[in-house]
Amino acid sequence: MTISSVKQSYGAKLGVGYIATATLLITVGVVTQDVASTVVAGIAGLLTLGSINAAETVASITELSAQTQRVADGDLDIEIDSTRTDEFGDLADSIEQMRVSLRDRLSEMEAARADLEQAQTDANEAQAEAEAAEEEAKELATAYQDIATEYGTVMAAAADGDLTQRVDVATEYDAMETVGQSFNRMMDELQETIETVTAVSKRITTETDEITETSRRVQQEVDAAVETVADIQTQATDQQTKLESAAVDIQDVSASAEEIAATIDDLADRSSEVEEASSDARTASETALTEMDQIQADAADAVTQVETLQQRMAEITDIADIISEIAEQTNMLALNASIEAARAGGQGSGADGNGFSVVADEVKSLAEETQSRADEIATVIAEVSEQTEEVTDSIQATETRVETGTETVESALSEIATIAEAVDDISASIEEMRETTSEQADTVQATADSIADVTEASAETATTAEEMSTQIRRQRDVVKSISDSLDSFRETAVDDLESRVRLFTINTDTTAASQTRAVGSPSIGGDD
């Protein structure tokens, strides 16, 4: 064993001391042959050895304690060194290595904490943007869904024939307001058309009743004329008087025929008005179809806006994923810091290990909070995306209802075309009645001429009376034909027109159709 190896080992030096003390005891015992002296010499040697060893050990421990205390106080730049080359020197070298490692780890942790704080700041900003986007999306989704539901309810009622329905256009969304205004304008024009057709139908009914009543009176007068002719035939002596009476009756018939002709002319004018109303209704329905096409285009624009919002939600989702990845990396860094703290504590530096562990726990806590915030952002984005899809579905449902409304308007246009055909038939019937009335007037005139001839030629009284009777019967048949035609006209064309108009519910007060009426508000004038 060399002197150098003894200096590098505290145990070796202590062993050499004990050997020297034992040698001293042996020497004293051999020389003095006295046990007491030997014991005293042994105790003195041990005390001397212990004092020297204790002094060196205490000095080394004091020196290391002072240096490690400065490290514990945060001075990681101090260099730990010792003049000893034994285990205490090795301990000083180990503490120096721990100091350097701790300083490097703390530098890394400071950098990691700075990165984590920046990530936390970015996460807070992203969360604020996500919350603002969520609020905006919720408001937009709720507003569009409510408006679409209200529009759908009103359009469904209108499709069932209730033309008094209007939508509330008081909304901050231009696209939906345009849809509502177009629908209300279409319903106003369609209701005005139906009201016009209804009014004309009522006038036709009233005037047809008047013509029918006039025909009945004419028929009664014709029957009276027939009886008069019979009296002429049976009472030849009163022939002249009866003929004069018949002439008067014929004049009444002629006047009635002229009245019928005038009424038929007026009815023809009314029929022309109905034709014009039907044409206006057809034009209004075609305009309504154009408006419905515009409504479909506006609804498509609304769907495009919602799809753009979905794309923004996808971008925010990508940002949240990046934040989650940063949080996971920070969490791994915190785990490494915890391992280093445990390692530092295992090497005997409890205070250093605890301080290192506190920093690691703080980093881990920040990482977990960042991960939690990122998860919340992802949850919010998922909810906003779901609501956006619901808005898209609602708008698409509105498009479907608009298509249904378009089909309804097309059906109404077909019905109006049918009404126009019925009006054409009415006009044809009126023309036939006009021709029949003209024939009746000619017949009455011929009858008057016949009565004049009978008056001038009494000898031909019987023959003329027979001709008169024949002419009057023919006239009665004509009047009956007119009456039957009017009844048929009333039962078929007019009633069919009224039944078709009654399919629609309209507001009798034409000023009540305002675009600012509440959705589904009841009609002011009641239903027809």
From Swiss-Prot:
GO terms for cellular component: plasma membrane. Its main location: membrane. The keyword Iron-sulfur does not apply. It is found in: Cell membrane. Transduces signals from the phototaxis receptor sensory rhodopsin I (Sop1). PROSITE patterns: CHEMOTAXIS_TRANSDUC_2, HAMP. The gene is htr1. This is Sensory rhodopsin I transducer. GO terms for biological process: chemotaxis; signal transduction. GO terms for molecular function: transmembrane signaling receptor activity. The chain crosses the membrane at residues 11-31, 35-55. Residues 214-455 form the Methyl-accepting transducer domain. Interacts with Sop1. Induction: Expressed constitutively throughout the growth phases, both in presence and absence of white light. Keywords: Cell membrane, Membrane, Methylation, Repeat, Transducer, Transmembrane, Transmembrane helix. Residues 55-107, 142-195 form the HAMP domain.
